[in-house]
Amino acid sequence: MRLCDKDIEEWLERKELIIEPYPNKTLINGITVDIHLGNKFRFFYEHTGSCIDLSNSKIIGGLSLTEIMSNEIIFSKEQPCFLQPGSLVLCSTFESIKMPNNLVGWLDGRSSLARLGLMIHATAHRIDPGWNGNIVLEMFNAGKLTLVLRPKMRIAALSFEVLSQPVLRPYNLRKEAKYKIQNGVVPSRIHKE
């Protein structure tokens, strides 16, 4: 069962679902909560490596995964981030989310931004039961013009579904979970698989 706005407000009030900072009620509509872009980004460098072998996370050409992207860069609220056409950037949400073990979240882009070419997640849009932390967005500019992003702009919407029962292995209790208590922009940890 998908939660409606009234349900979302009740889950937040009971602190079963935690979104920090607590969302203003104007951000909770229909079946979603609007969330904002954070101020932490990681950019991919231009490089000479020809490909990444996803089976072992090695880059053909001698580079490691950490060498193909910048360290975390923190932007001020007024500082624009320019996303060129055909470019991918990792960034975090402003909000931190703590999910209970009987709820799954879904991250969706905003239609108004998508119509300008902005994809806010490459494919990873599920927020697992037991998740705790910022959400990393894999933002891609599929449009023809450079897009200007700014910290704290409304960027996405979260919706939530109640599960038939609490999961046996919530994300926060799994030993192999690679992104537990994620704070900021954590790059791919495919090498830990």
UniProtKB/Swiss-Prot annotation:
Entries under InterPro entries matching the protein: dCTP_deaminase, dUTPase-like_sf, dUTPase_trimeric
Reaction catalyzed: dCTP + H2O + H(+) = dUTP + NH4(+)
Any one biological process term the GO annotation gives: dUTP biosynthetic process
Coiled-coil ranges (or none): none
Molecular function terms, GO-annotated: dCTP deaminase activity; nucleotide binding
Keyword terms, alphabetized: Hydrolase, Nucleotide metabolism, Nucleotide-binding
Keyword DNA repair: no
Pathway stated in the Swiss-Prot or TrEMBL entry: Pyrimidine metabolism; dUMP biosynthesis; dUMP from dCTP (dUTP route): step 1/2
Chain residues that bind dCTP: 110-115, 128, 136-138, 171, 178, 182
NCBIfam families (alphabetical): dCTP_deam
Family listed: Belongs to the dCTP deaminase family.
Function: Catalyzes the deamination of dCTP to dUTP.
Self-association state and partner proteins as the record states: Homotrimer.
Name used for this protein in its record: dCTP deaminase
Organism of origin: Buchnera aphidicola subsp. Acyrthosiphon pisum (strain APS) (Acyrthosiphon pisum symbiotic bacterium)
